[in-house]
A protein has these predicted regions:
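A carboxyl-terminal module marker
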Residues: 4-7, 20-22, 324-330, 337, ...
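His/Asp/Glu-rich mid-to-C-terminal helical/loop segments that flank catalytic regions of hydrolases
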Residues: 260-278, 448-453, 457-460, 628-634
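Short flexible coil/turn linkers enriched for glycine and charged/polar residues
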Residues: 4, 40-42, 105-108, 332-334, ...
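Class II aminoacyl-tRNA synthetase-like tRNA-binding/catalytic domains
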Residues: 168-217, 305, 369, 373-476, ...
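Glycine-rich, charged/polar anion/phosphate-binding loops
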Residues: 96-99, 179-183, 206-214, 252, ...
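RNA/tRNA-interacting regions in translation and RNA-turnover enzymes
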Residues: 1-386, 393, 488, 610
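An acidic, glycine-/histidine-flanked metal-binding catalytic module
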Residues: 246, 266, 270-280, 478-497, ...
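Short histidine-centered catalytic/ligand-binding loop motif
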Residues: 130-136, 251-258, 430-434, 480-491, ...
Length: 647
């Protein structure tokens, strides 16, 4: 997710000698990615991409804290000026506002009632909001957007006098309930959504996502409820995606915002409303906090940090980095005890997470490149993992003149292979036409071929397909698909491709069985299991279960001494019924004599086939007299066992 942050606003919390460009370069190298800097008048606005696991950086304060750790490691001075508020008493109940909640739905709720004068915001607030891409509305609404960008927790304002019974009853929605959001759009709720009603069943807020039109601040508003809620982010995301409401508040809340920053956010909002809306607090601050964040500490030794990173980082540097990031650190001899601040409890779990924080802030670019030390006796070998074999196969296809394609995992109904009731359908697809997860690669690769005007095409793709199961999650399986479109292409092109791939993987037990469904082609068999198929229609297509194939991959090379004596080669032409597979014929002929070295299919015309037979002895040179009885035995096998007619 991207946010816009003005440099002038950031300077309220960060004191540094880095120029805007130097700031952007240093942060992009070790932290967030600053994609663009735009000069706006005398100010600079940073366009910052924040990764989904760091909602704590979706604010001015969060970026300032992060920069105070990063910049000193890049040679700049940087001081974080923390956001502080005075201690403020709170209560769980108030006569002016009744809030009932479900602990399974909310982590924390805070609210306060204020009298205000509603009017336009001062210029500095509207200017700052405009630079962050937010339209100024009025001083009450603008304050909620302002404190969200500054501190990082969304908030909302209700018109207090439009709340029937002055009640907020937080509950799960019922399927079919309708709401009209503050932008005037009507939605039918799917059910199980987190909502607030007025105590009589009328929904007045879609919590954490968007307010409703029946409780929003209007021109005549005199009293407001400043409201902050921290909810079950899994339910919230589901609602947001189902309804297609992707407000910044929804996106931020679904990441799991830190509930401990709610009090400073609320107090800051109150102070801004006092200053710019002549606000008077007319109720206690309500604070309902059933699911408090549990503190977490992680221990890691200095030796482990140095071992994992590969260089020795001074102890003081480690402490400075961690403390600048907001962690509490105590050191006892060689061990660091790190207290995880609440904004990072969902992100930092194990010692390696701490080490990663130290390494990235210190700067990966400052760690010298070096090979691992090996002793003379070390038995070094390259691990032949899945990635290795896939790269070998891809390189081979490119060498053979194939083009690799990448297609979408989501497909239309037309590109789903088989009955549509077997398809995995998304509840919230990004586009209406692509709603199904593919169960085969071939239809998509053929679709790519159809969009190409060339008549001679050789395409391949290696990617995952998704197979529905009766119970549990679907299977995600790696497949290879090949499409050959050229003049005079035949089944044997596909067969040759499969055999060549098997050879690269060191597999010698691939076999083929004629398809039983009447389609011209063959099933690909390995260890008695069907792992794919070849089909010869308008195009020659191959699809193989790569995961099954790789289980048998073997990098061990078996050396055979070359024969010292020349082979004898004969061609045998026969007419043979089409239903006999070559693999079966080859097996029978090779077993007829130990001198039959190899059998290959040289030519095919309808049912007429020409086999090339290579005879070889490793002890002597063969003569025509040696092979005559073997040749007679081969002819007998072909005529009796395979009903062939010699040509």
């Amino acid at each position: 997710m991207n946010i816009l942050i003005p440099n002038s606003w950031l300077s309220d919390y960060l004191e540094t000698n880095a120029t805007p460009q130097q700031f952007a370069d240093a942060m992009s190298l070790t932290s967030v990615s600053i994609e663009r800097i735009e000069k706006v008048g005398d100010d600079f606005v940073y366009d910052i991409e924040v990764t989904t696991n760091r909602p704590d950086l979706m604010s001015i304060v969060g970026i300032a804290r992060e920069a105070s750790a990063v910049l000193p490691q890049q040679g700049f001075t940087a001081k974080f000026k923390p956001h502080t508020v005075d201690h403020t008493p709170t209560t769980s109940k108030s006569d002016m506002l009744t809030i009932s909640s479900d602990p399974t739905l909310i982590n924390r709720i805070m609210a306060v009632v204020l009298e205000i004068d509603l009017h336009a915001s001062p210029e500095y607030i509207s200017d700052r909001l405009t630079k962050t891409g937010v339209r100024s509305i009025n001083n009450a609404v603008d304050v909620t957007n302002y404190i969200m960008r500054e501190i990082g927790h969304p908030s909302h304002v209700f018109d207090y006098d439009r709340l029937n019974n002055h009640t907020l009853n937080i509950r799960r929605s019922k399927k079919g309930e309708k709401i009209t959001t503050l932008d005037g759009k009507e939605y039918t709720l799917p059910g199980n959504d987190i909502v607030a009603d007025d105590g009589n069943g009328t929904i007045i807020d879609l919590l954490g996502i968007m307010g409703t039109a029946n409780s929003v601040v209007i021109d005549t508003t005199k009293r407001i409820v400043l409201f902050l809620d921290n909810n079950n982010h899994n339910l919230l995301r589901k609602t947001s995606m189902n309804l297609g409401i992707r407000t910044e508040a929804a996106v931020l809340n679904e990441k799991g915002v830190n509930p401990d920053i709610m009090l400073p956010t609320l107090v800051t909002g109150i102070e801004l409303l006092k200053k710019h809306a002549n606000a008077k607090v007319i109720s206690p601050i309500i604070d309902i906090y059933p699911n408090k964040t549990k503190p977490k500490t992680i221990k890691v030794t200095k030796d482990k940090i140095d071992s994992v990173i590969g260089i020795e980082i001074p102890q003081k540097t480690v402490v400075d980095i961690l403390e600048s990031l907001g962690f509490g650190v105590t050191v006892k001899e060689n061990e660091f005890t790190v207290e995880i601040f609440t904004s990072r409890v969902n992100d930092i779990d194990i010692p390696e997470d701490i080490i990663e924080e130290v390494a990235r802030v210190y700067g990966y670019h400052k760690i010298p490149n070096s090979l691992p030390a090996l002793t003379e006796q070390a038995n070094y070998h390259q691990d032949k993992n899945e990635f290795y074999w896939i790269q070998k196969v891809k390189e081979a296809f490119k060498f053979w003149g194939f083009t690799e394609v990448y297609t979408y995992s989501l497909v239309t109904e037309e590109l789903f292979d088989g009955p549509i009731e077997n398809a995995l359908k998304l509840k919230n697809p990004l586009t209406e036409d692509k709603t199904y997860l593919r169960n085969s690669l071939v239809p998509s690769v053929i679709d790519v071929a159809n969009q190409n005007k060339a008549n001679n095409l050789q395409l391949f793709e290696i990617a995952n397909v998704y197979l529905k199961k009766n119970k549990g999650l679907p299977d995600e399986v790696l497949h290879l698909a090949v499409v050959v479109r050229k003049e005079k292409a035949s089944f044997f092109d596909g067969k040759g491709i499969v055999e060549s791939v098997a050879k690269i993987l060191g597999i010698t037990t691939i076999s083929f069985e004629k398809k039983k469904d009447g389609i011209e082609g063959a099933d690909i068999m390995l260890s008695g299991k069907n792992i794919g198929s070849i089909e010869a229609d308008e195009d020659i297509t191959v699809e193989i279960n790569v995961q099954e194939l790789l289980k048998h991959a073997n990098s061990k090379k078996i050396y055979k001494e070359p024969a010292k004596f020349p082979p004898l080669i004969e061609d045998v032409r026969v007419e043979i019924p089409a239903h006999y597979p070559f693999a079966k014929i080859e097996k029978a002929l090779k077993e007829s004599s130990e001198l039959v070295h190899s059998i290959s299919l040289l030519d095919v015309y309808k049912n007429k086939k020409t086999f090339r037979i290579v005879y070889l002895s490793r002890t002597r040179s063969l003569t025509t007299g040696d092979i005559q009885p073997i040749r007679k035995g081969i002819e007998d096998i072909l005529t009796t066992q395979f009903k062939a007619t010699l040509g």
